[in-house]
Amino acid sequence: MAALKYAGMEDTDSEDELPPGWEERSTKDGWVYYANHEEMKTQWEHPKTGKKKRCAGALPYGWEQETDDKGQIFYVDHINKRKTYFDPRQAFTVEDMQVKPKRYDGNTGALEILHGQDLSDKVIIVTGANSGIGFETARSFALHGAHVILACRNQSRASKAASLIMGEWSKARVEVLPLDLASLRSVRQFAELFKATKLPLHVLVCNAAVCSQPWRLTEDGFESTFQICHLGHFLLVQLLQDVLRLSAPARVVVVSSESHRFTDLLDSCGNLDLDLLSPPQKNYWSLLAYNRAKLCNLLFSSELHRRMSPHGICCNALHPGSMMFTSIHRSWWLLTLLFSLARPFTKSMQQGAATTVYCAVAPELEGIGGMYFNNCFRCLPSPQAQDPAAALSLWELSERLVQERSTPPQVL
């Protein structure tokens, strides 16, 4: 039907097709009824199947029901600035049967996953949200009503990112808070600033990362890739876990990478080695440091889920996609060239953000965690990433490292 197409829904031939002269309508509370224009009467049962139906859920996000001067109900799509007399919920009418979750793949975009979802009751933090996948992740959440916190080191770029989102939709709720994961002091300050807002926290997306960095130590004395990709996020979750508990059900989403498969964290005796995680300059290779940090992400995610799932907090890790043209490779011209050449054959930023968004809000993942996703499908990570002993060792080491660098509270 033309109305279906106008409302952004697909029309399909089925036994539900109405005879000539009939029209499908819905009440304000979502029950479907049928109008026979020839006989000027209405009924609850479908004229062919005899079944009763109701609309599935509330109106899609951004839609509003209004009444015209003649008393007829119509529907306004505020996001796309259009109106129709067709109830968009009628494309999803059900007979009190459970609908199977839709299957996604590597071509799916984040906004496609969020289609029809209302996130206006969600508060979401995204680290590294001023560019690339992080920006598309934050943008997708905000365009579906979530209150999104852009947690970024570069405040100027973060403010521009927030302006871009709000320029796309004036009602978007986007805030910027400073977060430099290369500084544990900054991580603590961010947690204090966020807690001062008194907001809940339903989703924390640990997205920020660096790759191919020249060797340098952070102000805390750690190799920068290790601290930015893992240790800073570890402390951030530790500091916000009380807010996550109070906001439960809540989710933590950790952006890892398939590159975790090409390294290990154990020494020749099978023990976790800090010199591998945070190596001295003479032993440093930037790509290997990145791979190890991504393996840390997976081990951290699984151990976090084991500890926090009894409190209503679930955690999953994911691979967003390979060789996408983001700013993560900006420190090495050779990688920039390689990524530029691969760009026509790789995912878009929207597609790269899809698995993050899926792990953050998919209804079928409610209460489920400790998993690794690629292209919105669960897959098995490397054997070492599945090692509970290694996950526990990394947790205990990370806990000790951040405690040793803790800043004593100031006396006011």
From Swiss-Prot:
Keyword Mitochondrion among record annotations: yes
Q: Which residues form the WW domain?
A: 16-49, 57-90
Segments of this protein annotated with the region Disordered: 1-24
Q: What's a GO biological-process term for it? A: intracellular calcium ion homeostasis
Q: Name one Pfam family in it.
A: WW
UniProt-annotated catalytic positions:
290
Top-rank lineage group of the source organism: Eukaryota
* Chain location of the short sequence motif Nuclear localization signal per the record: 50-55
Amino acids binding NADP(+): 128-134
Query: What exactly does this protein do?
Result: Putative oxidoreductase. Acts as a tumor suppressor and plays a role in apoptosis. May function synergistically with p53/TP53 to control genotoxic stress-induced cell death. Plays a role in TGFB1 signaling and TGFB1-mediated cell death. May also play a role in tumor necrosis factor (TNF)-mediated cell death. Required for normal bone development. Inhibits Wnt signaling.
Protein family per UniProt: Belongs to the short-chain dehydrogenases/reductases (SDR) family.
The protein, known as? WW domain-containing oxidoreductase
Organism of derivation: Danio rerio
**Gene that this sequence comes from:** wwox
